[in-house]
């Protein structure tokens, strides 16, 4: 049964599934859809064309689905789509997209978004990510699955953060982080493979060793960028007998090959 506090303001056109809870003084706009089992704390605003899945938990004073902070925005009906089983803590802001992109900001499933995080217009966030307190990502940023964003880190618009990567606290990121890599610094630079994180997620020692070798080829062995891509592609072919390792090496290679903004150096 849906439970709405007497002081909450829920527009009659909003669509709330069963077992949704809306806390005191929260505001739910007319174009909002909220899935079953989602809980919204007190003093939280959910507005815009926002669709939220099931079993999410929004803490107090979050601002979800507000218009993009983009001076080109002219009130187009852009969207925010949030998946299932996400935690969004206090004072987080997540904005809808813009017509200059696909018009949709997306948050996947099972993400942990801590207090004071900002996720700007048109961002694409995958699954199982962690945004530590005060992490801020600008418009059009893509954050892939299993990424960890350190506290007070900042990401420039249009940057991509590859799967299983980690950005250290108080870092400033202006170029792409390849998958599986740790980056840190006020001009974020690479600091090796995220070995501990990969172990926790069940990567084999063989796969981790291969990724460390690919990192060495890219960053340590003196190859040019084009030469490094060729060498890593050879590693993919040589690992064909180990499907899991070949897949991860291929993902590493394909990411750096596709980067348009350039990777961290």
Curated annotation (Swiss-Prot):
Domain of life: Bacteria
GO biological process, alphabetically ordered: lipid A biosynthetic process
Cellular localization per UniProt: Cytoplasm
Keyword Transferase: yes
Disulfide bonds: none
Main location: cytoplasm
GO cellular component: cytoplasm; membrane
Pathway named in the protein's UniProt entry: Glycolipid biosynthesis; lipid IV(A) biosynthesis; lipid IV(A) from (3R)-3-hydroxytetradecanoyl-[acyl-carrier-protein] and UDP-N-acetyl-alpha-D-glucosamine: step 1/6
Keywords, in A-Z order: Acyltransferase, Cytoplasm, Lipid A biosynthesis, Lipid biosynthesis, Lipid metabolism, Repeat, Transferase
EC number: 2.3.1.129
MF GO annotations: acyl-[acyl-carrier-protein]-UDP-N-acetylglucosamine O-acyltransferase activity
The keyword Lipid metabolism is annotated on this UniProt entry: yes
Endpoints of the signal sequence: none
SUPFAM superfamilies: Trimeric LpxA-like enzymes
Catalytic activity: a (3R)-hydroxyacyl-[ACP] + UDP-N-acetyl-alpha-D-glucosamine = a UDP-3-O-[(3R)-3-hydroxyacyl]-N-acetyl-alpha-D-glucosamine + holo-[ACP]
Description of how the protein assembles with itself and partners: Homotrimer.
PANTHER family per record: ACYL-[ACYL-CARRIER-PROTEIN]--UDP-N-ACETYLGLUCOSAMINE O-ACYLTRANSFERASE, ACYL-[ACYL-CARRIER-PROTEIN]--UDP-N-ACETYLGLUCOSAMINE O-ACYLTRANSFERASE, MITOCHONDRIAL-RELATED
Known role: Involved in the biosynthesis of lipid A, a phosphorylated glycolipid that anchors the lipopolysaccharide to the outer membrane of the cell.
Similarity annotation: Belongs to the transferase hexapeptide repeat family. LpxA subfamily.
Protein name: Acyl-[acyl-carrier-protein]--UDP-N-acetylglucosamine O-acyltransferase
Species annotation: Polynucleobacter necessarius subsp. necessarius (strain STIR1)
Name of encoding gene: lpxA
């Amino acid at each position: 049964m849906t439970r709405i506090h007497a002081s909450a303001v829920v527009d009659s056109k909003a669509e709330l599934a069963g077992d949704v809870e809306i806390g005191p003084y929260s505001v739910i706009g007319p174009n909002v859809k909220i899935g079953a089992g989602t809980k919204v704390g007190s003093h939280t605003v959910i507005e815009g064309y926002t669709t939220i899945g099931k079993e999410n938990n929004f803490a107090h004073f979050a601002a979800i689905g507000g218009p993009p902070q983009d001076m080109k925005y002219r009130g187009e009906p852009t969207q925010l789509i949030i998946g299932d089983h996400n935690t969004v803590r206090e004072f987080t802001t997540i904005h809808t997209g813009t017509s200059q992109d696909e018009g949709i900001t997306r948050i996947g499933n099972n993400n942990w978004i801590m207090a004071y995080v900002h996720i700007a217009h048109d961002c694409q966030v995958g699954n199982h990510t962690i945004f530590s307190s005060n992490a801020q990502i600008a418009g059009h940023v893509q954050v892939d699955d299993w990424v960890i964003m350190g506290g007070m880190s900042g990401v420039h618009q249009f940057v991509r953060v590859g799967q299983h990567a980690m950005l250290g606290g108080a870092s400033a990121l202006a170029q792409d982080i390849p998958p599986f890599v740790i980056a840190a610094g006020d001009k974020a630079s690479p600091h090796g493979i995220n070995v501990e994180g990969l172990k926790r997620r069940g990567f084999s020692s063989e796969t981790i060793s291969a990724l460390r070798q690919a990192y060495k080829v890219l960053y340590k062995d003196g190859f040019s960028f084009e030469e490094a891509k060729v060498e890593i592609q050879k590693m993919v072919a040589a690992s064909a007998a180990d499907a899991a390792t070949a897949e991860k090496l291929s993902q590493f290679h394909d990411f750096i090959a596709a980067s348009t903004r350039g990777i961290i150096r």
